Regions:
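Short, small-residue-biased leader/transition segments that mark boundaries at the very start
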Residues: 1-8
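Long amphipathic alpha-helical segments
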Residues: 5, 13-16
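Generic structural signal for hydrophobic
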Residues: 8, 91, 192-193
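Short glycine/serine/threonine/alanine-rich loop segments
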Residues: 13, 60, 96, 156, ...
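Intrinsically disordered or highly flexible coil/loop and linker segments, enriched in small
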Residues: 14, 29, 221-225
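Long, structured ligand/cofactor-binding scaffold of large enzymes
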Residues: 19-136
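Conserved catalytic cores of soluble enzyme domains
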Residues: 102-224
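Long, low-complexity segments enriched in small/aliphatic residues
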Residues: 223-244
Length: 244
């Protein structure tokens, strides 16, 4: 992944691990499947375009995955999908939130049906998490296809103002329907919020991460856990009337 990180740095962007570190408590991230790769070609990159693992936010457990847009455009392949599924299986087992940092072009064309099958497996794991633990999607960059229709089925979607979400792009729509539509009209974050697919639009990814941290501070880790307690500061926890 060194080449990937150099490529991201040259583009002036943050790496998936930097994004995860900005979201989670400092030093809490434990990576899963770092050496996973697609067999058959020794040049296939380790990690397969996604970073997965678990950590904490305000001391509470979360599972997180982040797309690496410099590896096959962040598209979903077999090893990629298996890594995300393993992370989600952990969230189901322990009952904790799942946070996806999405920056992907969707399915990996060269993997054909296998890529689509991985989306099916990811979606199958969203079902037992629904109503059990919060599922949150953070949208960064230009996201298309499965990198959009999977996130919109999660509980909360947070997007940066320069991100885009569409099932297919303007060129395909133009060739199929003859309709001219701009990328802004089709899938800008503001438009997606108007459509009801995005809950909050952040100025940048760091505001998005801060928003998600604050959002989780209001939510229980799972349906089996009590909601977090907040101290309003309006009155002491124990008053004279309580003692009388």
């Amino acid at each position: 992944l060194v080449g990937s990180e150099m490529c991201i740095r040259d583009r002036g962007r943050t790496t998936p691990r930097q994004r995860i570190d900005a979201l989670l408590d400092k030093g809490s991230f434990v990576e899963m499947g770092r050496l996973a790769k697609m067999p058959g070609n020794p040049d296939n990159p380790y990690g397969d375009g996604v970073v997965t693992g678990h950590g904490t936010i305000d001391g509470r457990p979360v599972v997180v995955y982040a797309h690496d847009n410099t590896v096959f455009g962040g598209s979903v392949g077999e090893a990629f999908g298996k890594k995300v599924c393993a992370a989600m299986d952990l969230a189901i087992k322990i009952g904790c939130p799942v946070i996806g940092i999405n920056d992907s072009g969707g399915a990996r064309v060269q993997d054909a049906v296998t890529s689509l099958a991985m989306y099916s497996e990811i979606g199958r794991r969203q079902y037992p998490l629904s109503g059990l633990s919060p599922q949150i999607s953070i949208m960064l960059g230009k996201c298309a296809g499965g990198a959009v229709y999977a996130p919109v089925t999660t509980d909360f979607v947070v997007a940066t103002k320069d991100s885009y979400m569409f099932v297919t792009g303007p060129d395909v729509i133009r060739s199929v329907t003859g309709e001219d539509i701009t990328i802004e009209e089709l899938g800008s974050a503001e438009k997606q919020m108007e459509y009801g697919n995005v809950n909050y639009v952040a100025e940048d990814e760091y505001e998005a991460f801060a928003y998600v941290r604050r959002l989780l501070s209001f939510l229980p880790t799972s349906a089996n856990d009590p909601a977090p307690l907040g101290r309003t500061g309006l009155e002491p926890e124990v008053t004279d009337s309580d003692l009388s």
